[in-house]
Amino acid sequence: MSHQHPVYRRIVVKVGTNVITGRNGKLDPAILDSLTSQIAALMQDGVEVILVTSGAVSAGRGIVSLSGNLTPVETRQVLAATGQIRLINAYNDRFKKHGITGAQLLVTKGDFRDRQHYLNMRTCFEALLQQKIVPIVNENDAVAITELMFTDNDELSGLIASMLQVDANIILSNVDGLFDTQSEGNPVIEEIDPGTKNFSQYIRPGKSEFGRGGMLTKCNIAHKLSRLGITVHIANGTTPGILQTIAHGGKAGTKFIAQKPKQSRKRWVALSEGLEKGAVIINQGAIDALTSGQRATSLLPVGITGVEGSFQRGDIIRICSTDGKVIGYGMASCTAEKARSAMGQKGLKPVIHYDHLYLVP
């Protein structure tokens, strides 16, 4: 059912490479015109929009004729560095026609690793939104370390959606949504319940031609966000008026229904896979206490059998069983050194407080 007024007040719009590039791999002016016009219309209706866009590398392909023997990493760096200028200008030139200013933010995964850095970044976004400026975000491919690169911009959009406590994350791809491959005709699945887990049965083989992400990545990010209280839509960005349809409650693509929102720090921890600076190994008794669901339980030193890495208070750490299975993630309440000296002992303060603990479903 469509509504006269938008059902969301703050959204992230993630635009995939295959949405804004044509078959020749170059930026598609008509699609860019459409998307920026839709965003401008939503802003006029009072919706705050954060734009996460891929496409810098593809834009670079339309500018640079590479020569010499560059490694794949060097090639990506050159194309991203040159293409990002064209990409941001393509958006800003169009936003200007609507009286809107865009701001470029290039980030790396490491920017989300430190809590204080994370909070500083959030302050910047909030200030831009307060001034009615559109944050235009992309991964800083030119300087990103391979080990700390995002899986793709779907992951980046999820981190930003969580950080800014948005109402919805709209992931625009070049497909209509998640298809039900188990049903005749393979219809688009309109809604996904937060309890759904096995998405691979609905995924068709293949992935984006120029981008790094596929539908399974999108579903996993969407599922995690929905469990954190953020609605996620996966839809076709080339469909005319797609953002208006979704923002006003109309049916389009696949909607991942949100659960009750979680606390800010819990959201940060929940999306911190790959950002951890160490790990604690816990025994079965601690696992049972954390996962019983009977009451809120912090991770105490008595249940810890090992400590890995060198982390400080406030760093993200991984929680593992003795056989290496990841149980969850948490924000350390002490240093690795103190955790080692305390492990196995009773009556001491938690190594990870419940409010800063996220268990893998």
UniProtKB/Swiss-Prot annotation:
GO cellular component: cytosol
Binding residues annotated for substrate, in chain numbering: 54, 141, 153
Keywords: Amino-acid biosynthesis, ATP-binding, Cytoplasm, Kinase, Nucleotide-binding, Proline biosynthesis, Transferase
Ranges where the PUA domain occurs: 277-355
Family annotation (CDD domains): AAK_G5K_ProB (cd04242), PUA_G5K (cd21157)
Binding site for ATP: 14
InterPro entries given in the database record: AceGlu_kinase-like_sf, Asp/Glu/Uridylate_kinase, G5K_ProB, Glu/AcGlu_kinase, Glu_5kinase, Glu_5kinase/COase_Synthase, Glutamate_5-kinase_CS, PUA
BP terms from Gene Ontology: L-proline biosynthetic process
Protein's pathway: Amino-acid biosynthesis; L-proline biosynthesis; L-glutamate 5-semialdehyde from L-glutamate: step 1/2
GO molecular function: ATP binding; glutamate 5-kinase activity; RNA binding
Keyword Kinase: yes
Entry-linked PROSITE patterns: GLUTAMATE_5_KINASE, PUA
Places the protein is found: Cytoplasm
Any Pfam family matching the protein: PUA
Disulfide-bonded cysteines: none
Family: Belongs to the glutamate 5-kinase family.
UniProt name for this protein: Glutamate 5-kinase
Species per Swiss-Prot/TrEMBL record: Chlorobaculum tepidum (strain ATCC 49652 / DSM 12025 / NBRC 103806 / TLS) (Chlorobium tepidum)
